[in-house]
Amino acid sequence: MHERLRIVIVGAPGYTGAELAAALASHPGAELVGLFGSDRRSSTGTAPELLSDLFPRLAGVVDLPVRAADTASILACDPDAVFLATPHEASEALAPALLAAGAVVFDLSAAFRLRDASLYPKHYGFEHGHAALLSEAVYGLPEVAGDALRTASLVACPGCYPTSVILPVRPLVAAGIVDRSRPVIVDSASGVSGAGRSAAVKSLFCEVSLQPYGVLAHRHQPEMAQETGARILFTPHLVALDRGILSTIHAELAP
């Protein structure tokens, strides 16, 4: 382990990756040694784009190039830790080799959040090929995992909506305050950046209205249920905001 932790971010050009890069760049114990984007960022004979070219606010803060992601290039950076801000299937494919090479992996996708591999086809659209890692992954909320995070090799960072629900609901369930025979009802509102940085008409600001989506079938519901121990009825809403989440939670008290 190096004196300053050598950090690689895969998925740096996305909103989450850029926020992470900015935070780590100012951390005294971290050194950013590699930024990677899609594996489609193949060389064209020109210099790779800098992250600050994609996010001008990071000029002078994170001026590293963003290169095409592949396992060999990532490991060539000699990282102590790798953050995967990548799609679920990409994280599931990359993590095993990185772990085998001795890197600590922080996965920001949902690829290792659920302990039951059979839930992935229904909620995330792919068969999980590394089910054994699901029992090894440590859920990345300190309020849930506690000291287990100190020695974890694979950290499954929590989802956005689940974080807003688990933090208030889990302690109430554990204390016996909530009636577990009744569902906990969650109405959440999220800003548009939660949909990612890819161009899409539905994400254009003038196209955004207050609207529910994923009603009774949102992929974050099983994660909430797993980590709270409660039955969850969850309805998310898209609102015309840049960022942020507001969750209004209704629960019946135990008799």
Where are these regions (language model features)?
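N-terminal Rossmann-like NAD(P) cofactor-binding subdomain of oxidoreductases
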Residues: M1-Y213
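Charged docking surfaces used in two-component/phosphorelay signaling
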Residues: G194-P255
